[in-house]
Amino acid sequence: MEMHMGEAPGSVKVTEWQQSYYGTDSGIHSGATTVRSDDDGTEYSSKKFTYTTTFTENPAEVESQLNMTRAQRVRAAMFPETVMEGSVIHSTQIDPSQQTNVQKLAEPSQQLKAAIVHLINYQDDAELATRAIPELTKLLNDEDQLVVNKAAMIVNQLTRKEASRRALMQSPQMVAAVVRAMQNTTDMETTRATASILHNLSHQREGLLAIFKSGGIPALVRMLSSPMDSVLFYAITTLHNLLLHQEGAKMAVRLADGLQRMVPLLKKSNPKFLAITTDCLQLLSYGNQESKLIILANGGPEGLVNIMRTYNYEKLLWTTSRVLKVLSVCPSNKPAIVDAGGMQALGKHLSGSSQRLMQNCLWTLRNLSDAATKQDGMENLLQVLVGLLSADDINMLTCATGVLSNLTCNNTRNKTQVTQSNGVEALIHTILRASSKQDVIEPAVCALRHLTSRHPEAETAQNAVRMHYGIPAIVKLLNQPYHWPVVKAVVGLIRNLALCPANQAPLRDADAIPKLVTLLSKAHQDAQKPGSSAQRSYQDGVRMEEIVEGCTGALHIMARDPMNRGTIASMDTIPLFVQLLYSPLDNVKRVAAGVLCELALDKQSAEIIDAEGASAPLMELLHSSNEGIATYAAAVLYRTAEDKNPDYKKRVSVELTHSLFKHDPEAWEMAHNTVMDPVLGDEELDGYGPAGYGGYADGMHMDPLDPEMQDDFRSGMPYNSMARVYHDY
């Protein structure tokens, strides 16, 4: 009795609702669609009658037959459903490939009729859904899981049609009921149906807003842990649509721990599913440092690199490369990507047919390369990069030269590999073709500077620059309008080229000496201008003291050549070199003492050095803790004292012996060798200056890219000498 008095079972309620609303099948119960597919064009134009074309030798009889059947033909063409089945209609169509005028006129009427029928059915769908919404909402909130399941199936069918879908998304109560049902049910079929409903609604902006307002995002994020693949697909696709088009969705997904659930999905094997997942990661991490760190903490770099290494589905590779590009500007993610083999995995896709994938990989490699200077196994990548130097695309050249510059910095193996791969010739041709493109020229010159020093093939590289007619082009880069970062790189390269005796004459013939002296004088004047040191230190990110040091160091090496020594001294440079001995920077003191050491080999220059009062600062420098400074100072003092009276020479000898050589008698002989070897400080590995130039400490020497540019690429990104972190792009 209590059972009869209580609430009816769920199945009974569904049956009662069906009977109260519909006397006939509405299409919901059976799943029949309201509008039949008319893909084959037969629904409204199928001919259940036969056209016959009769040929006779009597024209009058033919004309009579056609006149009698004219109305019948028009009616059959315009309203084919009015013709009785089995009727025979005479046709005037002679050529089956050409329509008659009546047939042509009938087409618009049939199209209009079809449109009217579709419109009627559309309106029927909308009205049906509108009437059903209140009751369906109630059923979705029912405690009986069977009722909820049946209601979810019905709503899922309704959301597959545009009219009913629009009606449903305009009901906040309905959408909220779907979200609650998805969260609360333990039935997988109900979960799949409700996830499908939200997926269908997410194709319109109104649906996205309804899902967002109803708290659908946290529910969808929880569905990312579902064991059912179809639920996973519906959830990730719906979230993807929300991230793309719904304002506030990104923050909501982050707050719901969406990233923590998405990153493990990278282990799935469906390429299309992975493409959507990686695009979600890109949308969430772009411009958000916290999201990048969450991806790192959940093993994202390893999963992303594995995708680049394993799959060949272009869209997946492209979306994955976009995520890596965003992560590659994060100082924490950068080494993780490199350690996971990211450089090699990205390098695999530099020779494919997809231009957008290649560009993404190049930008990412460019961002990562300063953290990969110690990586092994770069041979294939380096060869590909050298090959890309022949490209005409400015973005490819910018990236390829930048990566080569970083990977050859303080890495003997990479320097040798690039040199043996004809990298020097390719870089010179790149410089010649780049003209005024300074964002290409600077890294190309930096790469050449690295290749021409401190590795077994350095002398080969120095000779290759000359043999491929690179010296005149390189010296020209000292002129304006090239920016200071380019000038600084060129000065360092000239110094390295001068280490090869065969390059001394070509450098002199290219007017390298007067250009270096002019540049040195200008930089020294700029460095001495009144004002705070912070204000005068940098121009385009380059300290003028670094230019002073670089020019003096280059002149030091060029002064090894007797003819060059005379040219340098004749340009009234000795007073400036003596003045540089008072510099507060040890690097400047060292190169100044070094060039004076070479110039002092000529008697006339030695007399000028002494007359300029160099003895006092040189005596002071004998006590320097920098071995190079002390050694050069001793050599200059010894050479300038050779023509002095015996008492002076004795005093100098005693001072030198006491201050510099009391612990190493043999060093005295080394101090006055005819040619002093340049002393390389630790900071001069592949550059010069307090921080070294070539290492690209925390990023490459390039301006940040426009943060709004996610997929497009632009060229005008001038380098400067400051190591900096990239913004997202």
Curated annotation (Swiss-Prot):
It is a peripheral membrane protein. Residues 23-43 are annotated as: Disordered. Abundantly expressed in the successional lamina and in the epithelial enamel organ throughout cytodifferentiation (at protein level). Expressed by differentiating osteoblasts, dental papilla cells, the reduced enamel organ following tooth attachment and eruption (at protein level). Expressed in the epithelial crypt surrounding the functional tooth throughout all stages of tooth development (at protein level). Expressed at intercalated disks in the heart (at protein level). Expressed in the skin (at protein level). Expressed in granuloma macrophages (at protein level). Expressed in the ovary. The keyword Repeat applies. ARM repeats lie at residues 121-160, 161-204, 205-244, 247-286, 287-330, 331-370, 372-409, 412-453, 459-499, 501-539, 562-601, 603-649. One of its GO terms (cellular component) is cytoplasm. The keyword Repeat applies. Disruption phenotype: Reduced expansion of Kupffer's vesicle lumen expansion and decrease of CDH1 at cell-cell contacts in embryo Kupffer vesicle lumen cells. Failure of Kupffer's vesicle lumen expansion, however this has no effect on the asymmetric Kupffer vesicle cell volume changes between 2 somite stage and 8 somite stage. Initial tooth development continues as normal, the tooth enamel organ differentiates and ameloblasts produce a normal amount of tooth matrix. Morpholino knockdown shows an increase in expression of dharma/bozozok and ndr1/sqt expression in the majority of embryos at the sphere stage (4 hpf). It is found in: Cell junction, Desmosome; Cell membrane; Cytoplasm; Cell junction. GO terms for molecular function: alpha-catenin binding; cadherin binding; nuclear receptor binding; protein phosphatase binding; transcription coactivator activity. One of its GO terms (biological process) is cell-cell adhesion. Keywords: Cell adhesion, Cell junction, Cell membrane, Cytoplasm, Cytoskeleton, Membrane, Nucleus, Repeat. Interacts with ctnna1 and cdh2. Interacts with cdh1 during early stages of oogenesis, interaction is no longer present when oocyte develops into the unfertilized egg. Common junctional plaque protein. Required for Kupffer's vesicle lumen fluid retention and expansion during embryogenesis via maintenance of cell-cell adhesion junction integrity. Plays an important role in cell-cell adhesion via maintenance of desmosome and adherens junctions in the heart and is thereby required for heart and vasculature development, potentially via regulation of the Wnt signaling pathway. Belongs to the beta-catenin family. This is Junction plakoglobin a. The gene is jupa.
